[in-house]
Every structure is written in C-alpha cells, then in structure tokens.
UniProtKB/Swiss-Prot annotation:
Name assigned to this protein: Uncharacterized FAD-linked oxidoreductase Rv2280
Cofactor: FAD
Organism of provenance: Mycobacterium tuberculosis (strain ATCC 25618 / H37Rv)
Covalent link location (Isoglutamyl lysine isopeptide (Lys-Gln) (interchain with Q-Cter in protein Pup)): 354
Molecular function in Gene Ontology: FAD binding; oxidoreductase activity
PANTHER family: GLYCOLATE OXIDASE SUBUNIT GLCD
C-alpha cells in the first residue's frame, strides 16, 4: 500500500477508498462527448465536511490533483479526473439536512439528487426550481456549473437560487458564505464567486437553496411557425404579457422530427404542417388554480395565433410532460441521427435569429450541419454540430463561439467551460479577464490541486 493510499484510507476508511481496478469506469468521465476517459489513482467517498477537509489538506501537502464528482451529468468534462489524481465522490454526502419552510430554504449536502430534493419538499408546498434537464443531477453539480435549464426564464439559474454555502478550501479550511437570507452586503460575495467555478476554487460541502411555491396545475401550448423570426418575435410579447411562463423553448423542425421519431411522440400535428414549419415555440404555464391556468393557456394560444403561428396545440397532463421530457433528450436524439458535438452558447435574446441563421451558414460552408433547440426566453442556444472533418469542425466551433461573443454573448450559458472548451475560452475571451481569473484561482488554490486543466487548460 502506497503512502498516499494509506493516508487517504485513514481519513475515509478502507471501504470508502478505491484504487486500481476497484474504481468504477463511470468515475473516469462525465457526459462530455469528446474527451477520453481517465481513471484517477484514488477515489474517496467522504461522509462529512471534516473528511473532505482532511483529504484536501493531504492532497495539497503532497501535490495530488483533486477532482470533485456529483452525479457525473456534466457535459463539459469538469468531472473527468486527472491521471494520478484523487477523485472525491459525494455519493455518501447525499442528505437533505433540513427543509426550513419559515425561511423558504432547504439545507442540503452536495450529493443530493434533484429528484430526492423534490421528494423531500413535496409535502411542504415548496420546491427547488433549478431544472437543468437531468433530474438525477446533484445540487453540488448545479452549483459547480451554475446550472440553468428550461425554468431559468422564470426562476433564474443556480446563482439566483443559492443563498449560502459551506465550502472547503484546498488548505483544508472550512468556510461558510451567505445564509438563510436574501441580503448580504458585507465584503465580497464569496458565494457567487464559488458558484460556477467548476470545482477549481473550493469543494462545496453544504448548500442553502431557495424554495419557491409549488404550483400543481400545469399545461403547455406548442405552436409551429413557418418562419423562425416569427418565433423569436413572439417571445418578448409573451414575456411582456404578464403571464410568466416557466418554460419558453424553441425547437427547430429538424430537432422536432428527431424527437418525434426517437421518443415516439404523438403530438397530433398534421404532416403537412410539420413539413411546412421552420420551428416551434413551446410555452408552459403553471398556477395554483386550475381555472386561472385554463384562462392563461387560452390567452397564450390566441396570442400565438395573432403573432403568426400556423396553429396552437394545447398539451395537458401526460402529453405535456412527455414533450418536455423529450425536449430534455433533444441532443441525444440529434446524436442518434449523426451529431457529434454540442454547444450551449448564450446571446442576447433579440440576437438569436441572427446567431442561428449565421451559425447554420457557417456549418453549411464547413460541409456540416448545426441544428437544435434552446431556451428562447433567455437566449441560451443548444446546438448539435455534425461535421466529420476534425479540422473543419474545430474551425466551425471557433467561428460559432466567436459569433456569439461578437453579438454580446458568451461561449457557454450553463454547461461551463470544463475541459472541453478551454481552448476556445482562452482564445476568444478578454485576456485581462482571464488574467484576473487566474489570480483569483491562485489566491484560493496556491498549490493548484483543484481540477487542473479545467477552465484554464493548465495541467
């Protein structure tokens, strides 16, 4: 047994430290499509913040790189370990510690899956609303990537729904940031700095999340449009109406066809309409009162028809849920039809038509294709890229990311930089900002052990 194996085992116990062939293959990767799997030298499963602190202190003193893992649902490679490194799995730190209805918060450990948090709050009339599409994803992963998802148009992303953290620094020191309140104006906001840092600054061991009223009545309207510009012209009208949709998604015709064929969707849309439309707008509403929901759905349908929709299909209950669940799998449907990479750029909402039309043109010029869907309400584009020539694909991705930034957007809206996008980030982002980020990283992690290679590409 090596010295480090013995030290890590002493901290978490022999049963909770894995090495060699005992490390599961799943621990070698997340859901990033292009990065090669890499097993760590050690995989530890701590049960307490104190054990995490001891692991980090030992790793820091011995120069062992550390990668944190929640559910492994990330799409950018931030949970892919480093050769010779330590993977810290939060499988055992998976408890909802408290549901505080008076303050409308829950206190949870980082390994809690969204499904378990939803179950824990089901009888309270409250819920955690961040909905990144993978309900098996962990709250810690949500924090690490600043996850968003379909409900961000109404409820915001993770940083809008996290009020406080407990985190462990690479030195083994444990800090608390924020609290069970919306206001803190005392020094720098370390909560927000750690959110979205992809495990490069500190490891989160406890999260205080905001809970919102649980609205039990839900319905959706799906509207096909002949022209994508009409879809995007309808979005600000819907948002300005006061109806407050919790989901507002566009789906292009190619992606919808893939969803229908791979997910066995029955939407009742005639073939001639499906063949003639360019894109769809999905509007989901929720309410405590069924009659009010019905009135709002009727209003949305009428608005969409006035704004140029070919038709408006009301989906309730199981049919609405099935479409939303299928939308969550949109990229995997596109992948089944030949896509080999994904981007999640974000641009100002009004720039989406220009971004999408230009990106498709760039893809066609590279003998490829760019199709997809996205969060029309917040400008986050999920585009599946098909381009078989590796050099052409790399240039295409660079050009699309550059286009997003030229339009005032960013390379990633919710998946993060991870390992997959470091080259694009370093090439296209403001070097002054990158330098400042490096200094922040150095301040938190002077030994450079936390997720080396993530964000900055340094290993």
């Amino acid at each position: 047994m090596s010295e480090m194996t013995a030290r890590f085992s002493e901290i978490v116990g022999n049963a909770n430290l894995l090495t060699g062939d005992a490390i599961p293959e799943d621990y070698a990767h997340d859901e990033e499509l292009t990065g090669p799997p890499q097993k760590p030298a050690y995989a530890a499963k701590p049960a307490t913040p104190e054990e995490v602190a001891q692991l980090l202190k030992a790793a820091s003193e011995n120069g062992v790189p550390v990668t944190a893992r929640g559910s492994g649902c990330g799409l950018s490679g931030a949970a892919r370990p480093v050769e010779g490194g330590l993977l810290i799995s939060f499988d055992r730190m998976n408890k909802v510690l408290e549901v505080d209805t008076a303050n409308q918060v829950a206190v949870v450990q980082p390994g809690v899956a969204l499904t378990d948090l939803d179950a824990a709050t089901a009888d309270t009339g409250l819920r955690y609303t961040v909905y990144p599409g993978e309900l098996s994803s962990s709250v810690g992963g949500n924090v690490g990537t600043n996850a968003g998802g379909m409900r961000a148009v109404k409820y915001g992303v993770a940083r809008h729904n996290v009020l406080g953290l407990q985190a462990v620094l690479p030195t083994g020191e444990i800090i608390r940031t924020g609290g069970r309140m919306a206001k803190v104006s005392t020094g720098y906001d370390l909560t927000q700095l750690i959110i979205g840092s992809e495990g490069t600054l500190a490891l989160v061991t406890e999260v205080i999340v905001k809970l919102h009223p649980r609205l039990d009545h839900n319905a959706s309207v799906l509207a096909p449009f002949a022209d994508f510009d009409q879809v995007m012209a309808a979005v600000p009208k819907i948002l300005a109406s006061g109806l407050a949709p919790d989901i507002l998604e566009y789906i292009d015709n190619t992606s919808m066809a893939a969803l229908i064929s791979t997910q066995n969707l029955e939407l009742g849309i005639p073939d001639q309409i499906r063949d003639s439309c360019e894109a769809y707008l999905l509007v989901a509403l929720e309410n405590r009162i069924a009659d009010r929901l019905f009135e709002d759905i009727q209003t949305v349908g009428e608005m969409l028809m006035e704004l140029g929709a070919v038709d408006a299909y009301v989906l309730e209950g199981g049919s609405a849920r099935k479409l939303i669940e299928a939308r969550e799998k949109a990229f995997w449907a596109a992948k089944a039809l030949g896509a080999d990479d994904i981007i999640d750029t974000v641009v100002p909402r009004a720039s989406m038509p220009k971004f999408l039309s230009t990106a498709r043109g760039l893809a066609a010029a590279a003998d490829g294709a760019a199709v997809g869907c996205g969060h029309a309400g917040d400008g986050n584009v999920h585009m599946a890229i098909a381009c078989k020539d590796p050099e052409k694909k790399k240039k295409l991705m660079t050009d699309i990311f550059a286009l997003a930034m030229e339009l005032g957007g960013a390379i990633s809206g919710e998946h993060g930089v991870g390992r997959a996008k470091t080259g694009y980030f370093l090439e296209l982002e403001d070097p002054v900002k990158i330098s400042l980020m490096r200094r922040i990283k150095q301040s938190f992690d002077p030994a450079g052990i936390l997720n080396p290679g993530v964000v900055f590409g340094d290993t």
